[in-house]
């Protein structure tokens, strides 16, 4: 219900009928409206992430800042719609505040799932592989080679009495650390060496944290990784997470993320100058992601065999690296420079007198020693202690097994890389032997060999059918469409054809290579193919081959009219010119048989092609207009006869079956009639015997026979109606 409007107050310009105008003469200056002020307040509150402004807050704002009191106070609508003001107008609609970035990110991550087949995920696996390689290389190296911890560690703990073993190293470290008063920081170190060490140690900590962050992100992606189910990628968050907890991947991810190096590698109250990088070994169990990256890279690579060789070489380097670190660790555990086998000044092969002992020298010699041992060359100093003998023996055994496997894999990969060349060479050798056996001229033999060389040089030793036959028909059609579709569009008669026919024809195109001087066709030959020039040049010459009429370049088409079998063509299906190859020429060939086999399924396209062919011949004045528009080819006639023979054979087989069935039915009827006839004869004989008449017509004596004997009853038999002529015909049918 509408309420009565209040009486206008002359003292209140907002309610009186004489409200001042905004554009009249002598009108008061314009003031900011309530809507403007309220919108400013709303924006301010929204920026401060305040809650929604209620109707009560709006009224309070109006009463406090508006000079007219609460005459324009906003009241809630009675019908539950938009809030209405006192004058019947609608209140200002406050839009909901925008969500913060944290809320958006939380919602996005709650519904996020990863498709494992995307390119972005492949790039991410490459990042995880880099993090894995970092741990694989430096976990053992930082544990063994102390100088990797910082540039000052070598100057802090030097050789003590010519040697540096584990005991003197611990004492040196303890003496340096006990001189520190508090937890060391960058500014509290007593010398520049310690400050450099601290800075270098923080660099390793930074890289460790960075690689651990990569592992954390990869764990989340594994948690939301989609999976294949019935040929489709399942990406529902609930199903994906359930599949993750049911798999073994979550155990691997959890073990690889245990921060043992952070828990046990930072003693308190001082920092261990060496640390415990070996506690990061649990990061190395995440090898599955690296294997997936290598497999997908091999699949994507255009040179998969070369990539396999690189991977095998990398495996060899990793094995040698770890073995080198183990050698130096044993040398350090025994004592550097204590005998001629370990690293030190007594081992003249490792540290001659004129060579300075540096980190690079230590690692290079250890890597060299490991390479010689694992390759079973063995030109290294002989071991002295029992543990040295045991380590060398174990290394030699592992080297024989590992490198025998690696060499076998490398040999198989190299043989696979040369498999195509070997197959091609075998074909060429067979042709050479055949030509030598058949006494082929030397000039022709040279041409054949040059043709083979051209095929191998231009990588055309394999045909398209051999390469693509492993793919399904759909993928073969898509590849052929991308390779040959535009080429086929250049043919005049195919320009307006439907895409389905062109998709059929691109699969029929075959590549042929012609040598210099070869005639593709000669005048008067029967045309069975059309040609499209892919590469090279062709010349149209006279019968002598001396005069050149025209030169055909790449993309030219000829012979298309001869395979259409157009009725009324004055040339018939004969070639009208001599076409010769100038150099090596690659041609796409489409045969007449393949074209007409494809046109059977496209009758409209067939009519269109024939109409275009007639127009072209008519334009060149090579068409007999009185001839029928369509003429059957010999193949079509033969096919029609074959179809007629098949129809006759089918009808004959059906008639034979019907005859056999009818004959069987008639034989059954004849047998039944013979049985009934024999029964009638027996009854007739019995009746004649009862009346004293023999079958031969003589009387039979009835003396001594009781006259009251009743004659035997005749057995009721079924009457048999012989079929009429119409019924017999229907029966035969």
UniProtKB/Swiss-Prot annotation:
Q: Which region ranges are annotated with the description Disordered?
A: 1-33, 67-95, 694-733
Localisation: Cell membrane; Cell projection, Cilium
Q: How does it assemble?
A: Homotetramer.
- Give the recorded effect for residue 421 to W: Cytotoxic; traps the protein in its active open state even in the absence of cGMP activation
Organism the protein comes from:
Caenorhabditis elegans
User: What are the boundaries of the region C-linker?
Assistant: 419-496
InterPro entries hit by this protein: CLZ_dom, CNG_cation_channel, cNMP-bd_CS, cNMP-bd_dom, cNMP-bd_dom_sf, Ion_trans_dom, K_chnl_volt-dep_EAG/ELK/ERG, RmlC-like_jellyroll
Provide the protein name. Answer: Cyclic nucleotide-gated channel
Reactions it catalyzes:
Ca(2+)(in) = Ca(2+)(out); Na(+)(in) = Na(+)(out); K(+)(in) = K(+)(out)
Which Gene Ontology cellular-component terms appear in the entry?
Answer: cation channel complex; ciliary inversin compartment; dendrite; intracellular cyclic nucleotide activated cation channel complex; membrane; non-motile cilium; plasma membrane
Name the segments for region: Selectivity filter: 376-379
Key words, A-Z: Cell membrane, Cell projection, cGMP, cGMP-binding, Chemotaxis, Ion channel, Ion transport, Ligand-gated ion channel, Membrane, Neurogenesis, Nucleotide-binding, Transmembrane, Transmembrane helix, Transport
Q: In which family does this protein belong, per the annotation?
A: Belongs to the cyclic nucleotide-gated cation channel (TC 1.A.1.5) family.
* Swiss-Prot/TrEMBL site (Central gate) positions: 403, 407
Annotated consequence of substituting residue 453 to A: Fails to produce currents in the presence of 100 uM intracellular cGMP
Q: What is the effect of changing residue 429 to A?
A: Fails to produce currents in the presence of 100 uM intracellular cGMP
Question: Which residue ranges are assigned to the Extracellular compartment in the record's topology?
Answer: 149-197, 266-276, 332-362
Which parts of the chain span the membrane according to its record?
A: 126-148, 198-217, 252-265, 277-287, 309-331, 363-385, 386-411
Q: Which CDD domains match?
A: CAP_ED
A single GO molecular-function term is: voltage-gated potassium channel activity
The highest taxon in the source lineage is Eukaryota
Query: Gene name, please?
Result: tax-4
| Effect caused by changing residue 421 to A | Fails to produce currents in the presence of 100 uM intracellular cGMP
Give expression by tissue.
Expressed at the sensory endings of thermosensory, gustatory, and olfactory neurons.
Q: Could you tell me which PROSITE patterns the record lists for this protein? A: CNMP_BINDING_1, CNMP_BINDING_2, CNMP_BINDING_3
**Region described as Cyclic nucleotide-binding domain: spans on this chain:** 493-607
Q: How does it sit in the membrane?
A: Multi-pass membrane protein
């Amino acid at each position: 219900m509408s309420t009565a409007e209040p009486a206008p107050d002359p003292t209140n310009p907002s309610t009186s009928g004489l409200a001042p105008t905004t554009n009249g003469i002598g009108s008061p200056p314009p003031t900011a409206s309530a809507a403007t002020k309220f919108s400013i307040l709303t924006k301010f509150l929204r920026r401060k992430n305040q809650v929604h402004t209620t109707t009560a807050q709006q009224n309070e704002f109006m009463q406090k800042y508006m000079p007219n009191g609460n005459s324009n106070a906003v009241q809630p609508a009675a019908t539950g719609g938009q809030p209405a003001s006192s004058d019947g107008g609608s209140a200002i609609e406050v839009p909901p505040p925008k969500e913060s970035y944290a809320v958006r990110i939380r919602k996005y991550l709650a519904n996020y799932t990863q498709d494992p087949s995307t390119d972005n995920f492949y790039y991410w696996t490459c990042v995880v592989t880099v993090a894995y390689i970092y741990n694989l290389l430096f976990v053992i190296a930082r544990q063994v080679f102390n100088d990797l911890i910082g540039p000052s560690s070598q100057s802090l703990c030097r050789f003590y009495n010519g040697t540096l073993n584990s005991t003197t190293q611990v004492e040196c470290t303890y003496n340096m650390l006990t001189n520190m008063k508090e937890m060391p920081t960058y500014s509290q170190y007593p010398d520049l060496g310690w400050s450099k060490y601290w800075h270098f140690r923080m660099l390793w900590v930074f890289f460790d944290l960075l690689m651990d962050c990569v592992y954390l992100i990869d764990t989340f992606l594994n948690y939301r990784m989609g999976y294949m189910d019935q040929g489709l990628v399942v990406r529902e968050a609930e199903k994906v997470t359930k599949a993750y907890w049911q798999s073994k991947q979550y155990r691997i991810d959890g073990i690889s993320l245990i921060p043992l190096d952070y828990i046990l590698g930072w003693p308190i109250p001082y920092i261990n100058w060496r640390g415990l990088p070996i506690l990061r070994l649990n990061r190395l169990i995440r090898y599955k992601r690296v294997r997936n990256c290598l497999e997908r890279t091999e699949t994507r690579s255009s040179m998969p065999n070369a990539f396999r060789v690189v991977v095998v070489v990398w495996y060899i380097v990793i094995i040698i690296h770890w073995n080198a670190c183990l050698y130096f660790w044993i040398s350090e555990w025994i004592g550097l420079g204590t005998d001629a086998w370990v690293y030190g000044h007594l081992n003249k092969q490792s540290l001659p007198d004129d060579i300075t002992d540096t980190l690079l020298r230590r690692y290079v010699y250890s890597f060299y020693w490991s390479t010689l041992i694992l390759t079973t060359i063995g030109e290294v100093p002989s071991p002295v202690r029992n543990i040295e003998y045991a380590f060398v023996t174990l290394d030699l055994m592992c080297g024989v097994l590992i490198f025998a496997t690696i060499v076998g894999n490398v040999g198989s990969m190299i043989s696979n890389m040369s498999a195509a060349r070997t197959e091609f060479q075998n074909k060429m050798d067979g042709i050479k032997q055949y030509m030598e056996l058949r006494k082929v001229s030397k000039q022709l033999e040279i041409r054949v060999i040059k043709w083979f060389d051209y095929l191998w040089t231009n990588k055309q030793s394999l045909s398209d059918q051999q390469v693509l036959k492993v793919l399904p028909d759909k993928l073969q059609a898509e590849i052929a469409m991308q390779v040959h579709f535009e080429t086929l569009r250049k043919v005049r008669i195919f320009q307006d054809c439907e895409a389905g026919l062109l998709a059929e024809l691109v699969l029929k195109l075959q590549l042929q290579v012609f040598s210099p001087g070869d005639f593709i066709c000669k005048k008067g030959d029967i045309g069975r193919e059309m040609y499209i020039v892919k590469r090279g040049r062709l010349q149209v010459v006279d019968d002598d081959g001396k005069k050149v009429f025209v030169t055909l370049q790449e993309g030219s088409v000829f012979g298309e009219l001869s395979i259409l079998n157009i009725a009324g063509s004055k040339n018939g299906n004969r070639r009208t010119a001599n076409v010769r190859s100038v150099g090596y020429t690659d041609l796409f060939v489409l045969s007449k048989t393949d074209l007409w086999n494809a046109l059977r399924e496209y009758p409209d396209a067939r009519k269109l092609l024939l109409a275009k062919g007639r127009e072209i011949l008519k334009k060149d004045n090579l068409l007999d207009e009185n001839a029928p528009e369509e003429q059957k080819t010999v193949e079509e006639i033969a096919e029609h006869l074959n179809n007629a023979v098949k129809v006759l054979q089918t009808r004959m087989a059906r008639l034979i079956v019907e005859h056999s069935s009818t004959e069987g039915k008639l034989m059954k009827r004849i047998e039944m009639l013979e049985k009934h006839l024999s029964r009638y004869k027996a009854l007739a004989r019995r009746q004649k015997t009862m009346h004293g008449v023999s079958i031969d017509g003589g009387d039979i004596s009835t003396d001594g026979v009781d006259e009251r004997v009743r004659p035997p009853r005749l057995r009721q038999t079924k009457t048999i109606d012989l079929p009429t002529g119409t019924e017999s015909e229907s029966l035969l049918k």
